[in-house]
Amino acid sequence: MPPMAKNAAVTDVVHLDSDSDSDNGVVGGRESASTIAGAATMAPRETLECRSFWKAGDYFVIPNVVTPTAPGMLEHARVHPRFLHSNATSHKWAFGAIAELLDNAVDEIQNGATFVKIDKINIVKDNSPALVFQDDGGGMDPAGLRKCMSLGYSSKKSNTTIGQYGNGFKTSTMRLGADAIVFSRSTRGGTSTQSVGILSYTFLRKTGQDDVTVPMIDIDISKERPQPIIYGSPEDWAANLEILLKWSPFSTEDELLQQFEDVGTHGTKVIIYNLWLNDEGIYELSFDDDEEDIRLRDESVNDGKRLHHKILELRSHISYHLRYSLRAYASMLYLKKFKNFKIIIRGIPVEQFNIADGFRFPEIIKYKPHTATTEQASTEIKIGFVKEAPKLAICGFNVYHKNRLIRPFWKVTMGGDSTGHGVVGVLEANFIEPAHDKQDFERSSLFQRLEARLKKIVYSYWYSHCHLLGYHKYQMPADKSKKIAIPDQPPTISTVNPSPLPSDKISQGGPIIREINLSNATSSRTVAFASPHLRNSTGLRSNFQPVQLNPQPTAADTGNNLDGKSAGEIRQENLQLFMRCEEYIKKENETEQTVKSLEKELEEFKSKCAHLALLVDAKKKEMQQA
């Protein structure tokens, strides 16, 4: 494509603060591009002083002088660049930010997208690595790109689309790198366009901006010769182009527009550069450990310690790999396998993986919350032993929302013994809402009921099936227990082709029961709990006297009542109390962490206030001396 003429005109700088559809499809307020460019020329292109994401928001800026609003003009809301950074801190995990960008591409399947590519390139200007996301979806027209790069705008209201808040692009790109440039082509109403926009934290910081602005250019490519889409004046276009070339990875207009050559007639390419470093001064993302993958650095691998073989075996499982391998994480990120869509990482397609396909002794349990009234609230919970059990003590539930993995290997039971080892479940819970970073769920009453139900399912499945892996059928000694016995009845379930027990998996220490009568099965587990604030160093009160329930059938089981309650009712009540106790302990720990976090934030704010007070005093002295 020939370069654009130098006297062409394109859009003004757009402010990143609006969700309006007004102003002829151009979102947000505008400021003179030449004014912004004037500020841009004051500083040479360079990276931020602090390249660590978690420290990049700690700086003080002397605000620019705000130009008075002209008569008849509406004042637009101003968004400070520090808000852009703080908004991205919702992503504690870098792969969570990458998943947000993958969600955007997956949502484009309805517009014809067949792939999304994730790769690494080297920036010619300084030979630094950059992250590239590219899809062949419908692309974005000029108005669409402005909505994408504006705060809080979301037009995704479908029951199948994943995005919902309208902040995913901004928070995700900022979490991965300081700067991002977007190239997009689309066709709307017979008009084909291509647009370029840059969201640069480096530019905003280095030029002392106190308002987030996004330089953009738009081109009409419907005709034989590309024509600029004019919103302002030739001077504004020249200033916009100057900003793009100065703060993007591309030094000339030709290099900039060449990025469209592999986009095709429609699609989007996002380049994230000035990637963040960790505390040791090396890139947070690793591109060299595996040329077919993008990895997070696992500090425990290089600590020089020799690990036990069981720990090494545990780290070989995907439940551990997905924390550090993007390929492993992407393979499980979506529950249903795509038919005509591929996720391609560094040139190689990702093979989708559903851990439920390899379950041993799988079962399906239908679940619907009592308060649910819609069909969307019911779900099927697939549960079974992982194929590596009992060798690996993997456990937990992979919980999806609208086909997207939110909580991988969520452990709902407390550790301390072998109960639940090897038991893994998979479910799609569309009746609860994910958190903003899509790495957890909102703590609603529906979520709490689901958690309690999953605990019961794990216990029931374990007691009904643990002997199939060679574990002893649990029998609590009559003369030895200072713990609470937790019996449970297995829920109504449908068994899916249970496999015979391999002879090499049978324990030699006890009898193996090959047939299970689920209707008559009884089981028990011993767990001790004390009030959290009365525990000593061993975890129990010194005067704590646990209760023991005999797991063997008694006369009460056949109809005799104790204080009006049968033994079965007492056992059920005991189970409920046990699960409530677990929940309270978990809430107590979460509350303690929250208090510590708030205390830390309070100290930080006190320090900043003291610093600001010193600056104010110094300013007053300067004014008095003047």
From Swiss-Prot:
Keywords attached to this entry: ATP-binding, Chromatin regulator, Coiled coil, DNA damage, DNA repair, DNA-binding, Endonuclease, Endosome, Hydrolase, Hypersensitive response, Kinase, Nuclease, Nucleotide-binding, Nucleus, Plant defense, RNA-binding, RNA-mediated gene silencing, Transferase
Cross-referenced SUPFAM superfamilies: ATPase domain of HSP90 chaperone/DNA topoisomerase II/histidine kinase
Pfam families with a match to the protein in the record: HATPase_c_3, Morc6_S5
InterPro entries attached to this UniProt entry: HATPase_C_sf (IPR036890), MORC_ATPase (IPR045261), Morc_S5 (IPR041006)
Ribosomal protein is among the record's keywords: no
Main location: nucleus
Family, as annotated: Belongs to the MORC ATPase protein family.
Protein name: Protein MICRORCHIDIA 2
Organism: Arabidopsis thaliana (Mouse-ear cress)
Taxonomic classification: Eukaryota, Viridiplantae, Streptophyta, Embryophyta, Tracheophyta
Gene label: MORC2
